[in-house]
Amino acid sequence: MEIDKELAPQDRTVTVATVLPAVPGPSPLTIKQPFQSEVLFAGTKDAEASLTIANIDSVSTLTTFYRHASLESLWVTIHPTLQAPTFPTTVGVCWVPANSPVTPAQITKTYGGQIFCIGGAINTLSPLIVKCPLEMMNPRVKDSIQYLDSPKLLISITAQPTAPPASTCIITVSGTLSMHSPLITDTST
């Protein structure tokens, strides 16, 4: 029995994976729309949050009538309030892909995770901005198929043992969406 014998002849051509070519013709018209959402009033108690950007109300409302939507920019802002100087609050934030198993308790163990002390005598009273590294995850928030690696924000809050009467900071998510291919819907009602 010959082991080296080829049972079925194979084409010796080397094939290279290619990217699908762009569809000929003009590219679709896009609409760029800024958005901002208050996602957490923090500081009155310890809290954790995990927010997928595609599911935030302002994003889903803006993308309702479009087939495709991508993030052009994305950031989280931590806004100190009047209570911050008296009641310092620790805020941890981290941007991860939506399918990441990382939890808010693991922010400091994750690349890009940051911890801030909001308020107090010598700590920041200015808004803090943490940009999302969109080049490290999928910026698409709406498409013909569902993606599992769009941006997700992890937040961890550690409040003072003596809780303040109101929030020490407000956390907002802001950015710019690029949308195209309007859905055809009946608007007569």
UniProtKB/Swiss-Prot annotation:
SUPFAM superfamilies hit by this protein: Positive stranded ssRNA viruses
Top-level taxonomic group: Viruses
GO molecular function, one term: structural molecule activity
Compartments, record wording: Virion
Keyword Acetylation: yes
Keyword entries, A-Z: Acetylation, Capsid protein, T=3 icosahedral capsid protein, Virion
One matching Pfam family: Tymo_coat
GO terms under cellular component: T=3 icosahedral viral capsid
N-acetylmethionine carried by residues: 1
Keyword Acetylation: yes
Summary of the function given for this chain in its UniProt record: Self-assembles to form a T=3 icosahedral capsid composed of 180 copies of the capsid protein. The capsid encapsulates the single-stranded RNA genome. A pentameric unit may be lost during decapsidation.
Family affiliation: Belongs to the tymoviruses capsid protein family.
Protein name (Swiss-Prot/TrEMBL): Capsid protein
Organism: Turnip yellow mosaic virus
